């Protein structure tokens, strides 16, 4: 077998003959012997295509994904059912391989998808303008920080510790780039953002306040008072939202939130080891020209026919770099298409029914586990509990083919014994009861 499939021995012989070289050694004659490797590389022997396929399959078989076990892990990425309709459309060649629709006259299908996606996100969030997607949730949060900096030029960003840790880290990274700093606000004893601490942190130097609904622990926040406290000095209020909870929760726009962002993986995109997915971004109309990415718009041509165009293109490849608000490329458009198809498949009633189903199963699971809740208040799809023997629970559950949830101690030292448990429509009551049996073996008496 040839070492490289792209150049066989006869190929190399022909190339050497063409340049008048007798051997490969002749090509390296100018390189001193004392710096040349005089042995074969320490690499395994080459494989045929079939051998490579079999080897990779054996490696992949060692993984235990959501299809090989019952998973209650969430923490921002969730095991939702992806209907066949979604991938039957996203895998069509017309959508699978396009680039930015620079020529709208031949890209009407792709542009209409962007427009319909923006419309759906605006309706979900209760905000009038949306872009055509960003990379994922955390960078969408961070991009909102940049918008706030463009808007008021203040130097401080205030973030609740209820915001996803990855989002807070990404926000801090972006903030260093545009000369801001991030100040974090703690959670109260019930796992919600501490309103008094938030009010104390917001001052005349605050550019924006970042919240999450539901927050990372699954707590449904009281957005009204939090948004009011955030905006009392003229700061922007940014809220990261879980789109599939908006069938049962009020949209952030109704609370006076300026920018709503979020992770789109739950909308028709598989877990896929954490990506790719897409981020969404909606805002009040006054921020339209400072929003990141592309915005598709509806228009009419010279003959009065309905058409679609890229109305705003504020990425650095389209305008002067110093005027750009983002470097987003076309990479997430296919994932956003999946999100649009999924929302159309659900419909207005479907998203309500799904939210209600998740809420019922979440409350049933919290009661069935019987463990001390970290956040005893309202929850929709996720809740946090303290586990007396967390290692024991995880070990026993994993041996039974159950992933019991996400260890909170990774991100919250104060919850070293905490477990974050997520529910979707794929988790049945039988699955919950199976986890509850493991919880019963480690359960301590919970105070009344």
Residue positions per predicted region:
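Compact, charge-rich alpha-helical regulatory domains located at protein termini
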Residues: 1-38
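N-terminal entrance/gating region of PLP-dependent enzymes' catalytic architecture
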Residues: 35-116
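Short loop-beta-helix segment that forms the pyridoxal 5′-phosphate
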Residues: 102-106, 122-142
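General small-molecule cofactor/ligand-binding pocket signal
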Residues: 130, 181-185, 374, 405
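Conserved PLP-enzyme active-site core in the AAT-like
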Residues: 139-305, 370, 387, 392-395, ...
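Active-site C-terminal subdomain of aminotransferase-like
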Residues: 267-369, 373-376
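Conserved C-terminal alpha-helix-loop-beta "cap" of PLP-dependent enzymes
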Residues: 349-434
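A common structural junction motif
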Residues: 399-406, 439-447
């Amino acid at each position: 077998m040839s070492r490289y499939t792209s150049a066989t021995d006869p190929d190399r012989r022909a190339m050497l003959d063409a340049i008048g070289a007798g051997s490969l050694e002749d090509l390296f004659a100018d390189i001193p012997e004392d710096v040349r490797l005089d042995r074969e590389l320490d690499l395994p022997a080459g494989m045929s295509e079939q051998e490579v396929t079999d080897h990779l399959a054996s490696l992949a078989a060692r993984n235990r994904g959501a299809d090989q076990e019952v998973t209650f892990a969430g923490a921002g990425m969730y095991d939702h059912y992806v209907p066949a309709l979604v991938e039957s459309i996203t895998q069509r060649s017309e959508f699978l391989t396009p680039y930015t629709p620079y020529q709208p006259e031949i890209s009407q299908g792709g542009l209409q998808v962007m427009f319909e996606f923006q419309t759906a996100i605006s309706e979900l969030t209760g905000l009038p303008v949306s872009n055509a997607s960003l990379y994922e949730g955390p960078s969408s949060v961070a991009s909102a920080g940049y918008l706030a900096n463009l808007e008021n030029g203040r130097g401080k960003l205030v973030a609740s510790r209820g915001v996803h840790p990855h989002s807070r880290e990404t926000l801090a990274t972006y903030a260093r780039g545009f000369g801001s700093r991030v100040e974090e606000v703690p959670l109260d004893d019930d796992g919600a953002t501490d309103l008094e601490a938030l009010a104390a942190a917001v001052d005349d130097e605050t550019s924006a306040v970042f919240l999450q609904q539901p927050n990372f622990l699954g707590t449904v926040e009281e957005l009204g008072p939090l948004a009011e406290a955030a905006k009392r000095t003229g700061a922007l209020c940014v809220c990261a939202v879980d789109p599939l909870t908006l069938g049962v929760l009020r949209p952030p726009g109704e609370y006076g939130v300026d920018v709503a962002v979020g992770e789109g993986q739950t909308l028709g995109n598989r877990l896929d080891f954490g990506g790719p997915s897409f981020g969404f971004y909606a805002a009040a109309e006054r921020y339209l020209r400072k929003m990141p990415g592309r915005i598709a718009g509806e228009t009419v041509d010279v003959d009065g026919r309905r058409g679609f165009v890229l109305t705003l293109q504020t990425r650095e490849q389209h305008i002067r770099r110093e005027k750009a608000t983002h470097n987003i490329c076309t990479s997430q458009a296919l994932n956003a298409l999946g999100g649009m198809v999924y929302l159309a498949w659900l419909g207005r009633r479907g998203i309500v029914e799904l939210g209600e189903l998740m809420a019922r199963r979440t409350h049933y699971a919290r009661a069935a586990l019987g463990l001390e809740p970290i956040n005893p208040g309202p929850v929709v799809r996720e809740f946090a509990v303290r586990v007396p023997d967390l290692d024991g629970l995880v070990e026993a559950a994993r041996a039974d083919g159950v992933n019991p949830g996400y260890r909170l101690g990774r991100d919250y030292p104060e919850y070293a014994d905490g477990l974050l448990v997520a529910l979707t429509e794929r988790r049945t009551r039988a699955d919950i009861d199976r986890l509850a049996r493991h919880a019963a073996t480690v359960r301590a008496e919970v105070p009344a």
